[in-house]
Amino acid sequence: AKSICKEIGYPVLIKAAAGGGGKGMKIVEEEDKLENLFLTAKMEAKKYFGNDELYIEKYFKHPRHIEVQIMSGKNRTVHLGERDCSVQRRHQKLIEETPSPVLTEEQRKDILNKTVKMVEQIGYEGAGTVEYIYENGKFYFLEMNTRVQVEHPVTEVQTGIDIVKE
């Protein structure tokens, strides 16, 4: 873990691999705190999820959480815009906005087009959500959820498309 953290650069976020809901997450600001927080996260992961596997990612101090909703099938992928999920409490989303109030039109077009291209390249079919951390004008890929998320009605209201039906 120490070598990974040095490579990524502090601060880092230790997360439960099987986690969710902010459980099993620890922010490590400096190396001398790593061992204790790593063990604590491991115990919490086992307790909450029955799996003590962890992963480490860069921690962003003032991030925006941007999600791109996609639908893909029959050799065609389309985006249904983005959602800004940055208003959170304990790593749980409270408010979803679409379109994101912090992106310029150029940034929006860029991330939407790059997301469609990525989904096409991996050959994914179905509804999905590609998540990014956005900070200081840069996007960092977080994950892709290959299912319809609870937030999908925000996109449905904005686009008029019934994602589940489609």
For each feature predicted by the language model, list its residue ranges.
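ATP-dependent carboxylate activation and anion-phosphoryl transfer catalytic cores
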Residues: I8, A16, G21, V28-E166
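Gly/Ser/Thr-enriched, mixed-charge loops and adjacent short helices
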Residues: S3-E7
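N-terminal cofactor/phosphate-binding cores enriched in small/glycine residues
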Residues: L13
